[in-house]
Structures are given as C-alpha cells and as structure tokens.
Amino acid sequence: MSDQQLDQALQQEENSLIALRKEKLAAERAKGNAFPNDFRRDNYCDALQKQYADKTKEELAEAAIPVKVAGRIMLNRGSFMVIQDMTGRIQVYVNRKTLSEETLAAVKTWDMGDIIAAEGTLARSGKGDLYVEMTSVRLLTKSLRPLPDKHHGLTDTEQRYRQRYVDLIVNEDVRQTFRVRSQVIAHIRSFLMKRDFLEVETPMLQTIPGGAAAKPFETHHNALDMEMFLRIAPELYLKRLVVGGFEKVFEINRNFRNEGVSTRHNPEFTMLEFYQAYADYEDNMDLTEELFRELAQLVLGSTDVPYGDKVFHFGEPFVRLSVFDSILKYNPELTADDLNDIDKARAIAKKAGAKVLGFEGLGKLQVMIFEELVEHKLEQPHFITQYPFEVSPLARRNDDNPNVTDRFELFIGGREIANAYSELNDAEDQAERFMAQVADKDAGDDEAMHYDADFVRALEYGMPPTAGEGIGIDRLVMLLTNSPSIRDVILFPHMRPQA
C-alpha cells in the first residue's frame, strides 16, 4: 500500500469514527442538555495523588473521603477509566453496585477523549493505585474526533504545531514545557518587582519602528488614514518613561520582525526589556547572571543546564570578552592588524560568508566577522562586550575608546539570548547617529533605523544615566526546557496554511 493509499484509508477510518460519535451526540441531545455546565469539582487529580500518597488501602476505606473530579477520558478499560485534568491523571472505578443501570449503560457509549464529571470516595487498588470509587458520573462534553493512537501519540512535528490543542492533550512533556514557560515569566516579573521595577505597557502599533535593527511589519490605520508598524522593540518608549521619571521600568510582551523563520527565529516573539537609571551595562551583567541562576535553580533544581549533548554552567561566572578580543581568541590565524585594516576586514568578512554590500564601515565589518566566525563557538555563557558604535546607534560610547560602546550581548549555546547597553542620553549624539542610520537605509540596509524626532526631543529634556536590556523569553525557555526549536516553546507558532 502506498503512502497516499494509507493516508486515504486512515482518513476513511477517522471519518467513520467521527460519524459514529456524532450519532452518540445526537442521542445525548435527544435526552436534553448535551453540554451541561452545572458541575463544580473540588479536587485536582495531581493534588489528590500527592495528598493521599501515604494512605493505605485500609485507611482510605475507613476514612471514606468524598471527592468530585472532572477530566478527559484517556484510557477506558471497562471497569476502570483514567481521566486527565490540567494537573495530572487519576483512575475512576465503574462500580456496578453504586451506579444506576441507566448510568452504566451510558458509560458503555463513552469514548476516549470524552470529558466526564465523577463523584465518589477515594480508594486504593491491590496494585497500590489511587482511584475514585464512583457513586455518580456523567458526561459533560462529547468528543467528536478520536485522539491519536495512545502508543504512538501525535508524532508528526508539523501536525503538533498546527494542532497544538491535540499535542497538549496527549503529550505530558509538551504540557510541562509550557508550565515551565509560565513559571519563568512569573519569576522574572517577581525578580524585577522585588527590585522596585515598575511593569508598564507601551504601544504595539507605532508610527516609527525603532529600538532594534530589523525589518518591520507594515499595516494601515483606517481611522487615522496613516501607515503604521508592528513594533520591533519597545525600547524608545520605555526610555521616554525614564525621561518622565519612572526610573526603573520593564515590559514583557510581543515584538514583531518581518524576517526569516528558523529553529531560532519566529517573526512574533516574546521579549523582556528593562531599564534602570543610575546604572550601567556592567550592573546589568551582574543582574542577568543572578536572574539566570535563579531561573535554572527554580526550573531544574540546579545551576547546571543540560541542553542536547551539552551542559551549560550557570553557577560559574559568565565569560566577559570584547567583540575584538573574541575574534582573535577563536581565530588565532587573524591578527589585530587584519581587523583594523578596512580592506582586509572586508575581505575576511566576505570569505567568511557575510553579505557585504560595500558601504560598511570598519566596525560593521568587524561585527560581521564576529557573527560568522565566533558566534556559533560560544557554548558556555559569554558576555560579548564593546560593540562598535556604528552598529549600536542607541548605546553610549565607551569613555576610553569612543569607537566602541558600553554594550554586551549574552550568548549561550551559540545563540544570542540578551542584548544590553549603557543607554545613549546625549540628544545631539543620538540625532547624529539617527542621521547615519538613515544614510545606511538609503544605501540599501533594510534593517537600519528611522529618524525618530520625538525621541530626540525627549532626550533633550534630559535622561539620567541609564542601563537597559532585552532578553528573548523564547530562547531562554528553549534552554531551560532542552527544546531544540523555538516552535517547541511557542504555543501557536506561525505556519503556512495547509493546502
């Protein structure tokens, strides 16, 4: 049988099962309300398993503990069914002595995936399993589509992403990944608020896309009759708030970048950005190390983070190395003279595979070389510092070397996880850098920034010395859950429509 014939046979089988389940639903409708909403549970499956884990069969029988549970049927073995709620699973026992004939007849028609409500008392089987000996049970929701085969699950990766709701039903590991994601975000929020940061919300629709070097999504505001952009970063609005007197702010929200899709990139992604006045980028490095250690300990119970065949050590001091020095360290065949000669640097960048357009300055070329020859080699946590000013239009120049900025990017496993710098608060310097970005855009750089006159005006009122940082939540969760693709940690990643 060919793959096409097999697919057709499986589809026909599924269609027949759906038709049978629809007949059962029609019978439920004929009885009255087929989708009741008057049941209130008083227990979760996992809580019961934990609370009564040490109770013996005899102790449970004597206590006769009443419970109300609800969940989806995941296994049906006649006398015993296994139901699943958001916390876990528990068995329920179909007791012919305590259930009515009508109920027993109804139970026989139920299918895997149906959602039921059960009342009864806790008991323990001869094998030691906790279960609910039901005194009443009823159907709450009829499932019309059969779940994937229990032995094989939902294994097609694309279908898992397209039908995440099914993926979540049948795969506990997937549910745990998204529980961890929620934990991570909650802890980040708590971590910052304990340090007097104020959570804020800034516009998702912007008239000028700014705060990052990226290509935006464009849209049209009908009421105002104007072009607008989905934000690529909230940075410029958050710094306006620092100007306004909110000296410590953060936002956890979506950014949108109209760029490629890969295991590390999704056009819609979640970012933490935070800003604190009277601090610099080195303060942010210390804060970031502390946060990452806490998150690893919270999720894994250890500061050693396994990822694939590697282990990242969050408990050790993160390496701190400049862009320039990192190129020389990981490429000993290159010299400082090579990197400081624009013609040689251009040739090295081209040979390494960078897309050199011809208008790049020396600093831009050095970063291109770093991205091609160094980035993927940074396995253990590295703070890469002192990015050239021409690729850091919003960062403060370094006091000792004005050709570079007080900036770092954090790399773990060869991936950028965070980007931070001491913020540029010189309004005149900012205006000049915006003009340089406009020139780059005119020369063909789609990712160069626009000129934002209102942001320059805000700086003219005076912004205190400030440090800011952005951390990619999705990539961070990938690390902490050992997930190989960014799509594994986004509930509904972007997919092409099915034909």
Swiss-Prot record:
Q: Which domain of life is it from?
A: Bacteria
Q: Which cofactor does it need?
A: Mg(2+)
- Major enzyme class: ligase
Subcellular localization is given as:
Cytoplasm
Principal subcellular localization? cytoplasm
Catalysed conversion reaction: tRNA(Lys) + L-lysine + ATP = L-lysyl-tRNA(Lys) + AMP + diphosphate
Which GO BP terms sit in this record?
lysyl-tRNA aminoacylation
Annotated keywords:
Aminoacyl-tRNA synthetase, ATP-binding, Cytoplasm, Ligase, Magnesium, Metal-binding, Nucleotide-binding, Protein biosynthesis
NCBIfam families in alphabetical order: lysS_bact, PRK00484.1
Q: How does it assemble?
A: Homodimer.
Q: What is the recorded name of this protein? A: Lysine--tRNA ligase
What is the gene called? lysS
